[in-house]
Amino acid sequence: MKILIAYTASGTSDNPCVRLLADGIRACGYEVVCSVEEFRSNAADYDIVHLQWPEELFRWKAPAPADVDTLEQQLQTLKNNGIPLIYTRHNTLPHHGNPLVAEAYGLVERYADAIVHLGDCSLREFTAAHPDSEQLQVMIPHHIYEGLYDMDITRDAGRRALGIPADRLVVLAFGAFRHAEERRLVWGAFRRLHYPAKFLLAPRLWPYTRRGSRFKGLKRLAGRLLYAAAHSAEGFFDSRITSPEPLIPDEQLPCYLAAADVVFIQRTDILNSGNVPLALSFGRVVTGPASGNIGGLLAETGNPAFDPADPRSVDIALERAARLSATDQGARNRAYAQEHFGIGRIAAMYGGLYERLYDGKRQ
């Protein structure tokens, strides 16, 4: 069976989720091609087409109305040719509110033959919004990043690599900060945490970097000066809130997770976060919003959740996470992730879905 995943898995992506999944599906015996260009020009040559983020179809740039019209034509052609379309629902709506991208989300959801939900909240949300839908609804969790990261690096080794004192409670907020509210959430919660020796590890909290700035001229110079000022103040605030690069290299990422005691998910309004299964797989205690699929997973695994709009709720959750970091909660998290989110298990679940749709097409 020939599978097309409409995603440019170049190996340099900020998010390696899809390329790892594709490798896992190939290991199950399927021919898998990851390409947006193939979706645009040769989708009819495949047995199954699998979409991830609709934004990927526009190369994460703002589409023109004609681009959305073309997408609908492509989706209609797939339907006319009887080629099953699968959509993995990572988000409810686009993060940045572009109405044309939101329209593309609606088209993909409407034309999909099967919708994969990464958690129960997504499934309930979608079926409530579309009670008459006859599409196949399937729940397949987010996989962990086996084979990409060294998950056996020790806490001491991670801290030595990053220059973090061994005796600190380290709170890690990982990934991009999408807006100022996420920065305020993390910084405020950390400052209010009643812990005598604490350290905030949030390498992308500060929006300026030493290299890789998109600005030019005076704006680039100002960005570098702001980066230098924040970098100089880190020792005073017991924190690491700057990064010289826009992205953390894959080979350094395990050091950050190994160094942490608690992983803080800073999203204020989101359906999914791959950082939750990632942190669980490294055996770290996690705290995050009690919403979307994140809230359900945290409750299932015994990790504290909070209401981002309620500072007291955030404080209680972070304090509880700090206490849990001294127990076997991290070990339980790791065992849970390995049992439920292993790439082999998740890839096999997708393989079963492909077979189900392919067999249905032939009947």
Report the location of each language-model feature.
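Conserved acidic donor-binding segment of nucleotide-sugar-dependent glycosyltransferases
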Residues: 299-312, 319-326
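Short hydrophobic beta-strand element within catalytic cores of glycosyltransferases
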Residues: 265, 285-288
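Nucleotide-activated donor-binding/catalytic signature segment of Leloir-type glycosyltransferases, i.e.
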Residues: 212-255
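Short acidic/histidine- and often glycine-rich active-site loop of Leloir-type glycosyltransferases
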Residues: 278, 291-305
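Donor nucleotide-sugar binding/catalytic pocket of nucleotide-sugar-dependent glycosyltransferases
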Residues: 113-128, 132-150
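A short helix/loop element that forms part of the nucleotide-sugar donor recognition site in Leloir-type
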Residues: 149-164
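Conserved donor-binding/catalytic core segment of Leloir-type glycosyltransferases
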Residues: 165-181, 190, 201
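A charged, aromatic-enriched C-terminal amphipathic alpha-helix characteristic of glycosyltransferases
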Residues: 325-359
